[in-house]
Structure formats: C-alpha cells, structure tokens
Swiss-Prot record:
Subcellular localization: Plastid, Chloroplast thylakoid membrane
Biological process, per Gene Ontology: photosynthetic electron transport in photosystem II
Quaternary data: PSII is composed of 1 copy each of membrane proteins PsbA, PsbB, PsbC, PsbD, PsbE, PsbF, PsbH, PsbI, PsbJ, PsbK, PsbL, PsbM, PsbT, PsbX, PsbY, PsbZ, Psb30/Ycf12, at least 3 peripheral proteins of the oxygen-evolving complex and a large number of cofactors. It forms dimeric complexes.
One term of GO molecular function: chlorophyll binding
GO cellular component terms, A-Z: chloroplast thylakoid membrane; photosystem II
Principal cellular location given in the protein's record: plastid
Descriptive protein name: Photosystem II CP47 reaction center protein
Source organism superkingdom: Eukaryota
Gene: psbB
Organism: Chara vulgaris (Common stonewort)
Family: Belongs to the PsbB/PsbC family. PsbB subfamily.
Amino acid sequence: MGLPWYRVHTVVLNDPGRLIAVHIMHTALVSGWAGSMALYELAVFDPSDPILDPMWRQGMFVIPFMTRLGITKSWGGWSITGETITNPGIWSYEGVAAVHIILSGLLFLAAIWHWVYWDLELFRDERTGKPALDLPKIFGIHLFLSGLLCFGFGAFHVTGLFGPGIWISDPYGITGKVQSVSPAWGAEGFDPFNPGGIASHHIAAGILGILAGLFHLSVRPPQRLYKALRMGNVETVLSSSIAAVFFAAFIVSGTMWYGSAATPIELFGPTRYQWDQGYFQQEIDRRVRLSTSQGFSISEAWSRIPEKLAFYDYIGNNPAKGGLFRAGPMDNGDGIAVGWLGHAVFKDKEGHELFVRRMPTFFETFPVVLVDEEGIIRADLPFRRAESKYSIEQVGVTVEFYGGELDNVSFSDPATVKKYARRAQLGEIFEFDRTTLKSDGVFRSSPRGWFTFGHLCFALLFFFGHIWHGARTLFRDVFAGIDPDIDSQIEFGIFQKLGDPTTKKQTV
C-alpha cells in the first residue's frame, strides 16, 4: 500500500473488525508488560528490610501499585510488612503477574482471530450493507460498563465488602497496612489525604457512569449535535479518548507529586514538600518534647523515635534530589541504608545548643552553618580559614549523639565534628552500604519522581495529539477540499482541487 509510517493507521479507518483487532493487541501488550515487569521486579526485590530498604528505595514501580490495591504476600514466603507467611493464596504478587501474562496470551489470540475474521455481519449497516459502527451506542455501552466497574471497585473492593480494602497509613507513614475503608460522604471526602473519599467518589462516579451509559443507550443524539461534533467519524472517538487520557495523566501527576491518600509515602516514598516544610523534623521534635515532659531522659526520648520516621527525615529520600538523567533506584545513589547513627546535638564551649542549617532541595552544595535556638550564627565551616571567626576550632564545637547506634557517644575532635556537621545538613544521619551496589554517591529520585515526570511528559504529548486529531475531525472537509454535504457526483481527476468546478483541468 506504500503508506508512510505516520499514516499506517489509515488501514483500520473503515474496517471495524481490524480496528477491534489492533485494540485487543494493544491491551495484550499492556497486560503483558505489566505482568512481565512485576515478575522482573519480584526477581530483583529484596524484602528483608521494610524499614531502611523499602520498595521505593529499590526503585520498584509496579509493586507499589499492586500493594496499594491490597496485595501484600508473595509465593516466596514473605510479606511486604516484614513477617513470614505460609499461605499467600492466589492473589499474591506472583499470582497477579501470572494472571496478567495469561490474559495477555488470550488477548493475543483474540487479536489474531479478529484480524483474520474481520468482515463480520455485525459490523455492516443493515440499511446500506457497508461497514459501519454505531459510535453513540458504543459510547453508551462503554460508559455503562466502566461505570459498573467504577461502582464495584468503590462499593466492594475499597470498602472490604468483597475484597481486601486498600493500603491505609497514618500521616507520617509509620503504621501502614491494607484495611477496609468506609466511604466519606461529607465535605471531608474532598480532602485528598482522606482515603474515605476514594470509596465515596468511586461509588458516586460509578452511579453517574451507569446512569449516563443507560441514557446514551436509550437516547439518540440530535442531528445537529451529531453533525457538529462529527459523531459519525471514528477520529472523533480518537480525539476525545486522547483528551480523557491526558486529563487523567495531568491529575495523577499532581496527586503523585504533591501526595494524596492514593499515593502513600510507605509505597512511593515521601514528597519533596515534606522535606521543604520540615514535616518529619517537626513531628520528631514534638515526640521528643513529649517524651522529655513525661520524665524520659534526652537519650531515652530519642531512642523512642521509630527508625522509619527518622529515615523519612533525610534529604536523600526527597524525590526532587534526583537528576533527570540519573537512572536507577535510590539505593544506586547514596547506597543501601544500614542503620541510624542517632540524632546529632552540637554544642559550643559556652554551652549553647547549635542546629545545623539544612540544605534546601535544589542545592547540590550548601554552606555549613550552625545557629543557636534564636537563629544567631555561632559556628560554620569557613571557605577561607584566614578570615574565619566562627570555625569549629575557634568556637570549640562538640557533638553528642542520642538514640541510634551512637547513643550517648560524643566527639570533640574538630575533624570528626566537621564530618557530622556536613552530614547533619542532610537531615538525620545514617550509615550506608555503598559497596554492594557500587553506589556512586549521587542522589537518585524515587518512583514518585519518575511517575510524575513520565505522566507529565505523556500528558503534554497527548494534549497536542488531542488538538491534532480534533482539528482533523472538525475541519476534515477543509483539509480534504470536499464539502461533506455535497450531493453532486464528483469524478476524481477532473478538477485540480477536488469538487471545485472553478479549477477544471485544461486538456491540451
């Protein structure tokens, strides 16, 4: 047929049978990729330390999505929460992967069948005998079925009525587990961090979809609207479908990057704004103050801080610290976290407690400055020693650790104090294993960053695709030079511009 690569889809334009075939094949590829990717991730995933080496540190992409829908067990005998299990059942990680691959194979066969048997009676208009699709009717069917699925997910899966529920956690990502959710029907359901809104919105949207589907099945569109929106043209379907997809992609980019109940930090890692706002630092400080007010010593108060919470308060887990071309999981950057050294408390020789000013997100290097509780600079690591007034040596800074591996250990050696001051810039101080994965020390992004980046890029691309195909549909007659309502017979080749009698070709 000699079509250029960008016009090959023309072959399914007026061929409903093969249009279905290519869509089934596309679904087969998507399902096959999902199953294969899940198996690959399970092959490289190390479930041994859910606290310091969770899935998001290891760069897992599909495992978090399975987990948030209620899958937590593996046929390998482990659970995502760390305990050993004996009977994972069919709906394990491997079970879901296998189902996707089996579905992919069946869809592959169905696509071949529909490609071979393309000329079915079903696709022919009984009045004209030509291939035709009743697009408004198909729209109604799809709307009804997707509404049914949406309602079923909200009413049964999320609520635990017939299903596992979804991943629910506290605001600080400490106590996450899969549990059933009650729908939130009040204003609180619109809080993006309230999981009850997920149930209620799916139920409401599902009911709306079912009713809208039944409406479109029982009511034909008015002729003017049908013509104005080119409802008889399958490219209209393409254009509006692309619009739906890019709109959804923009929405999920936002819910992923800014955080929501649907993107828990235990599965996708913390957001950059939690570092920017000192979210975990404030919670840790609150817990320490509470413990000391209850009579615990400083050391005991810091020892009560969960290692998981301390690990969130570390800049290397900020998804905005990764670079665009730094491929690979976070563990390939700063290494695999081994343990928390404890909270470093700095003091000068006058007894002032000093706080290291933390590095902002978009800095690669940042001056090491130590301030007291009033914000007055007391010490720093000078760039030029000759002019320094606040150097560690001059001020006599010492460091003592509370909680963690170095609990109650103090250092006064200036070189050691400087080392820990530099590391305190990055939040809580952890020990990392950089040899196992040959980690290069350069921060990587979490799946939260990769998901956002990918979906924003494709949303932008699909936005232009929507404009392109929408324009082609609406202005088809202008582009083709044929009035769609023309009644007179047109002979191809007589006119230079098709259907324009003023451009009749001159014969020699």
